[in-house]
Swiss-Prot record:
This is Ribosomal RNA large subunit methyltransferase E. The gene is rlmE. GO terms for molecular function: rRNA (uridine-2'-O-)-methyltransferase activity. Specifically methylates the uridine in position 2552 of 23S rRNA at the 2'-O position of the ribose in the fully assembled 50S ribosomal subunit. Belongs to the class I-like SAM-binding methyltransferase superfamily. RNA methyltransferase RlmE family.
Amino acid sequence: MAKKPGSQNTSGRGQRDLKVKVKTARGRKLSSTRWLQRQLNDPYVKRARSEGYRGRAAYKILELDDRFRFLVPGARVVDLGCAPGGWCQVAVKRVNALGERTSKAQGSVLGVDLQEMEPIAGATLYQLDFMADDADEQVRVWLGGKADVVMSDMAASSSGHKQTDHLRIIALCEAAAYFAFDVLEEGGTFVAKVLAGGAEGELQKLLKQRFAKVANIKPPASRQDSSEKFVVATGFRAKA
């Protein structure tokens, strides 16, 4: 039986230091073999499997929240592009969406994605394109009001060209930011993944117009060889 997700020791340390070497099977590309070997030896992958999370990305949002404390009991959270669901699992626990901590306020977690997902206890999941014309209005209806947190771990499909992928994810992040402007409560928080590459300036400028503070963070759970980082914008101003 999988353990309940927890916030302790998010570093991935404490796992047995056993390295797995994968042989290249006939018909399998060398790059696929390397990816599989990295997955099998990744301490965060091992922790996610043992603690019941749907992916190692859960530890990224755990580490970001440990620092910025935006997933508080009672918060209403929207997770854009939420598949496979690791971020939703973390949010459910931290905002007390199941009401397990009776002395704390009970929050809610709403996840949207283009693909259908397996249910997550404590989260409400919808198959929705957040860039559709009426998506923001629909989300507010489902929430019964505005959100305290909008978060996104989305990434566009990889093209294999670093700069193209960078531009695509910046465009996706900007779309998520405009969505957040429409659904966030005053003082709310926006969290999103970006890839470093030189085109972040306009995104930073946009966010600084609407948030009191904007930080760029590479949490420990992000792989060191990745250009991935996260923007955490706090103190949303409903009026620019």
